[in-house]
Swiss-Prot record:
One of its GO terms (cellular component) is chloroplast. Keywords: Chloroplast, GTP-binding, Hydrolase, Nucleotide-binding, Plastid, Protein biosynthesis, Transit peptide. It comes from Populus trichocarpa (Western balsam poplar). GO terms for biological process: positive regulation of translation; translation. Promotes chloroplast protein synthesis. May act as a fidelity factor of the translation reaction, by catalyzing a one-codon backward translocation of tRNAs on improperly translocated ribosomes. The keyword Plastid applies. It comes from the Eukaryota. It catalyses: GTP + H2O = GDP + phosphate + H(+). InterPro entries: EF-4 (IPR006297), EFG_III/V (IPR035647), EFG_V-like (IPR000640), EFTu-like_2 (IPR004161), G_TR_CS (IPR031157), GUFP (IPR027518), LepA_C_sf (IPR038363), LepA_CTD (IPR013842). It is an enzyme of class 3 (hydrolase). The lineage of its organism: Eukaryota, Viridiplantae, Streptophyta, Embryophyta, Tracheophyta. This is Translation factor GUF1 homolog, chloroplastic.
Length: 678
């Protein structure tokens, strides 16, 4: 029997006694108090045994063997009183993903050599933008006061576009870490997610991150949290996720303060889906939290909202990689594979139950994903239309909120009208299409869903400006409004109020949350936000202001359709719906831009902005004049007049039958301008 040393983590060397066999190595981990801190995930009593099978002839376990043993240790069933389900709430760039990385590392869930920044963020796009787009989950094992605990971290996106996914993640937890940057303080989106957490009755643990920064003011931020949110910060944890300060205190607080799940194992199965994604080999993989009952491999399961049933081919836990188990009980978090073909069959927020013993009621809070922002996507190369369709279908397998339908334009050919949750969602989908599928795209100006009340009492929902009914056929038009909350330093209150009023905002209230920061609330049309509102907000506040919005419903507005005509022909992709008061300024800006960009023709080209048959703004592109008199060296004037008359007749005929080709660059520049001026 040989005595060897194995490095368990960054700070511990543990003597191991090994017993060599040809095909089986048994590791007996002994407890050495002076060597191994009690907070370590590998701290255990004398009876603990980790068995692993490996092909070995030397008796010395490899790093892979040890990782396998540690993984099996995390799979061990723990009593429900020792389970803790929690998530992390934070504004963008307040250190949520860094803290999650450090928790995974400190609990030994991920070895240091495997560690990379934003470990739970799998997409390159997430790492580049520094945001979380898709949810992830991780099961960690942590030993506290000689007792093993199972900690389930459910990662959440922080952006307002994904607030529904955040709400379903919170519903799968009993507690939340509220992470606030100690140098910046409370931000608008943090506030919105905290209110969601309070609605779900979660135990909230305040964590002040980035205390190592020179500008950190933890005492001021504590006071701000107490005043703005109303949370007691006397026991707030000060930490630096980057430097690893305060991580042990956070883990201890999760065990001490987050309540365990209710013991409802005897009830019929009810499991909440908080995420799903499409795997090309196994179909849809569903992430879920078991609320009541238990689920076994091979069970016939039923999705209560989609009314579909499947057999659970594989179930397991996320640690953070998928590890198979035979059964999951109430309170546990895991995944399942059931050869599901479409993400639409297993939507976020749906309830899983047994087919033979259905639950009486589904879990509350399920909503269909409703697109709020629409735009047209057209391939620059018409030959890429089928590739664009295939790419959208593949993205939709992973993203049930993405909607699309074919659209045809005289100017840009065949494309798709796509619906998104919000502007960030739209940008992410466009970037993924271009990056992952090598497509070159033209996007039309984003629009929202308008509700049109027609004279025959029909109600039509319209997201495409070119499909808006004629003025004589509609009685009124309604548009979606949002309630927007701006958090800003007091120096920028005036300029941000001016911005909101420029965008048809209706002032609701303003309050000072601290001596130097204010919260301003407005109601304004969603259409006014889908342009450059966020860019203007950051520009006018020098980056210090933040915002959060919620849709409050539809209101009637004085809206009209503004058409652009070139040489008398309407250009459908440039049509837009605007408020009557802004029609002239938008029309003038678009016609002037087109005049700069369209190449001159052999005949005069009028560029007009029209409301119905009425022209409200017009520019003319002067003709290229060919010198037909160049070959005349004098002589009779009638010869020159005849040539000029013939040229004028030709230009008149050309103007009647000629077509003006709007170059691709002009389209892209004007569409960009539309996004800015609307």
């Amino acid at each position: 029997m040989a005595s060897i040393l194995l490095s368990l983590n960054t700070h511990t060397l543990l003597p191991l006694h090994t017993r060599t066999r040809t095909t089986k190595t048994t590791l007996k981990i002994l407890r050495f108090s002076h060597k191994l801190p009690p907070s370590s995930p590998f701290y255990c009593n004398h009876e603990t045994r980790l068995h692993l099978r490996c092909q070995t002839t030397t008796g010395t376990p490899s790093a892979a063997d040890f990782a396998a043993a540690a993984g099996q240790d995390r799979l061990r069933k723990v009593p429900i009183k020792n389970i803790r389900n929690f998530c992390i709430i934070a504004h963008i760039d307040h250190g949520k993903s860094t803290l999650a990385d450090k928790l995974l590392q400190m609990t030994g869930t991920v070895q240091k050599r495997e560690m990379k920044e934003q470990f739970l963020d799998n997409m390159d796009l997430e790492r580049e933008r520094g945001i979380t787009i898709k949810l992830q989950a991780a099961r960690m094992r942590y030993v506290y006061e000689n007792e093993g605990y199972c900690l389930n971290l459910i990662d959440t996106p922080g952006h307002v576009d994904f607030s529904y996914e955040v709400s379903r993640s919170l519903a799968a937890c009993e507690g939340a870490l509220l992470v606030v940057d100690a140098s910046q303080g409370v931000e608008a989106q943090t506030l919105a997610n905290v209110y969601l957490a309070l609605e779900n009755n979660l135990e909230i643990i305040p964590v002040l991150n980035k205390i190592d920064l020179p500008g950190a003011e933890p005492d001021r931020v504590c006071k701000e949290i107490e005043e703005v949110i109303g949370l007691d910060c006397s026991n707030a944890i000060h930490c630096s996720a980057k430097e690893g300060i305060g991580i042990t205190e956070i883990l201890n607080a999760i065990v001490e303060r987050v309540p365990p799940p209710r013991d409802t194992a005897a009830m019929p199965l009810r499991a909440l889906i908080f995420d799903s994604y499409y795997d090309p080999y196994r179909g849809v993989i569903v992430y879920f939290r078991v609320i009541d009952g238990n689920i076994k491999k091979g069970d016939r399961i039923y999705f209560m909202a989609s009314e579909k049933d499947y057999y659970a081919d594989e179930i397991g836990v996320l640690s953070p990689n998928q590890m198979q188990v035979e059964e999951l009980y109430a309170g546990e978090v895991g995944y399942l594979s059931a050869s599901i073909r479409s993400v639409a069959d297993a939507r976020v927020g749906d309830t899983i139950t047994h087919y033979s013993r259905k639950a009486e009621q589904s879990l509350p809070g399920y909503e269909e994903a409703t697109p709020m922002v629409f735009c047209g996507l057209f391939p620059v190369d018409a030959d890429q239309f089928s590739e664009l369709r295939d790419a959208l279908e593949k993205l939709q397998l992973n993203d049930a909120a993405l909607k699309f339908e074919p659209e045809t334009s005289n100017a840009m050919g065949f494309g798709f009208r796509c619906g998104f949750l919000g502007l960030l969602h739209m940008e992410i989908v466009q970037e993924r299409l271009e990056r992952e599928y090598n497509l070159s795209l033209i996007t039309t100006a984003p629009s929202v869903v308008y509700r049109v009340h027609c004279v025959d009492d029909d109600i039509v929902e319209c997201s495409n400006p070119s499909l808006l009914p004629e003025p004589g056929k509609r009685r009124s038009v309604e548009e979606p409004f949002v309630k927007i909350e701006l958090l800003t330093p007091k120096d920028y209150i005036g300029t941000l109020m001016e911005l909101a009023q420029e965008r048809r905002g209706e002032f609701k209230e303003m309050k000072y949350i601290t001596e130097n920061r204010a919260s301003i609330t407005y109601e304004l049309p969603l259409a006014e936000m889908v342009g450059d509102f966020f860019d203007q907000l950051k520009s006018r506040s020098k980056g210090y202001a933040s915002m959060e919005y919620t849709v409050v419903g539809y209101k009637e507005s004085d809206l009209i359709r503004l058409d652009i005509q070139i040489n008398g022909d309407p250009v459908e992709p440039l049509a837009t719906i605007v408020h009557k008061d802004k029609a002239y300024s938008v029309g003038r800006a678009l016609t002037q831009k087109l005049k700069e960009l369209i190449p001159r023709q052999m005949f005069k080209v009028p560029i007009q902005a029209c409301i119905g048959a009425k022209v409200i703004a017009s520019e003319s592109l002067s003709a290229i004049r060919k010198d037909v008199l160049a070959k005349c060296y004098g002589g009779d004037i009638s010869r020159k007049k005849k040539l000029l008359k013939k040229q004028a007749a030709g230009k008149k005929r050309m103007k009647a039958i000629g077509k003006v080709d709007v170059p691709q660059e002009a389209f892209m520049a004007v569409l960009k301008l539309e996004k800015e001026v609307l």
